[in-house]
Amino acid sequence: MTTHYIAGNWQAGQGETLQSLNPVTQAVIWQGQGADASQVDAAVQAARQAFPAWAQLSLEARIDVLEKFAAQLKVHAEAMAQCIGEETGKPLWESATEVTSMINKVAISVQSYRERTGEKSGPLADATAVLRHKPHGVVAVFGPYNFPGHLPNGHIVPALLAGNCVVFKPSELTPKVAELTVNCWIAAGLPAGVLNLVQGARETGVALAANPGIDGLFFTGSSRTGNLLHQQFAGRPDKILALEMGGNNPLVVDEVKDLDAAVYTIIQSAFISAGQRCTCARRLLVPQGAWGDALIARLVEVCKTITVGAFDEQPAPFMGSVISLQAARALLAAQVELAAKGGVKLLEMTQPQADAALLTPGIVDVTAVADRPDEEFFGPLLQVIRYADFDAAIDEANNTQYGLAAGLLSDSRARYQYFWLRSRAGIVNWNKQLTGAASSAPFGGVGASGNHRASAYYAADYCAYPVASLETASLALPATLTPGVTL
């Protein structure tokens, strides 16, 4: 099976056997063999050979290819949404919004490039100061499974726009989405070698990250893998490394007037995408007392009614499946562990079908747990922590190695300003779902959540490096020579 796209040609893999499964039915969606180290190297070399010509194209010529790619996505939007839903388990309504985000990324990236990394100049007394940006060269892009189209697209589009060439390794759990995406690039007329696709799991990823021919690596995924990459690239300032990782995100609730609005926002923050967004709320901080009791009771009541189902089920469910049976089992095990440590299951997360990766929402009160794990439970498992006062809530919110997203539900602007100032996170929302983000704003966090603002407006910053120049059209002696020099 032709599973890799290298130097403009599809070819079969020479590495480990791979399968992509529908997480609900367990039907085989895609199968092939991963790329071995020699194929990874061939992809890097193909990108290296294509780089000079691609980088020397005018910006407008590269934009033309990107816009044709967006047009191809529009043509194939239904098939792409179907594939995303089938491979990830997310409902079709959500898969369709992901394709829309992929399409919109082109215009956003062009605007960002012009504003943040375009050419600027200013006159000096005897020269012109010019700021331009140059591409790094060949960059590797590692994509995640939760948004297999949108998130790698957020690296690839600005990287190509800046003049880089790319070797793309998607998640081994979503190879078909990657294949469809690359086919859209081919149909858009992207020259051979500019974008290369290598499918595979750990073997392929290790070979790509270690290949001396790459000038950088852009990664979106788990903190565990991101930390390994960070260690691998330690002492290599010659390589650009952009990491967008996870979070143990807190959502603090104040005593707001509209209880149901708070409940709805919590659900959208914790359980959308079956809890498989890096910005999902993992910890819900609720005030002690009668108001907090009422909020939790209402939250549990509503969460019991949340519909869970297959990606194409009608009427459409709110939540689809998690990515795999393995992921579902790990989440169920995490719930058991929290209970063993003293957590109280307010709403037990269950697996309605033993052979399907469908999970119902789970809510565990971990207030009494002394050694709460600072982990990202990547699924529909929400931990509740009761707090005595607002300062204690902020302290608990910041009690994490991560720093991706934090949110406050409060009727008080003063409280929000106080919260915003003290929060340690790259995204801080007020009375909006934690998973909400603006495409024109930076996306990313601090601490163990990453180092750059990946896949969004500020992606332009790490896809090219600034070059400062002093320029004048003719060489001439200055009117006054430096002391000690005679001509």
Swiss-Prot record:
Active site: E244, C278
Pfam family, one: Aldedh
Cited InterPro entries: Ald_DH/histidinol_DH (IPR016161), Ald_DH_C (IPR016163), Ald_DH_CS_CYS (IPR016160), Ald_DH_CS_GLU (IPR029510), Ald_DH_N (IPR016162), Aldehyde_DH_dom (IPR015590), SuccinylGlu_semiald_DH_AstD (IPR017649)
GO BP: any one term: arginine catabolic process to glutamate
Pathway the protein contributes to: Amino-acid degradation; L-arginine degradation via AST pathway; L-glutamate and succinate from L-arginine: step 4/5
UniProtKB keywords: Arginine metabolism, NAD, Oxidoreductase
CDD domains from the UniProt entry: ALDH_SGSD_AstD
An annotated Gene Ontology molecular function: succinylglutamate-semialdehyde dehydrogenase activity
Residues the record lists as binding NAD(+): G221, S222, S223, R224, T225, G226
Reaction catalyzed: N-succinyl-L-glutamate 5-semialdehyde + NAD(+) + H2O = N-succinyl-L-glutamate + NADH + 2 H(+)
Family, similarity comment: Belongs to the aldehyde dehydrogenase family. AstD subfamily.
Classification via HAMAP family: Aldedh_AstD
Function field: Catalyzes the NAD-dependent reduction of succinylglutamate semialdehyde into succinylglutamate.
Name this polypeptide is given: N-succinylglutamate 5-semialdehyde dehydrogenase
Record organism: Pseudomonas putida (strain ATCC 47054 / DSM 6125 / CFBP 8728 / NCIMB 11950 / KT2440)
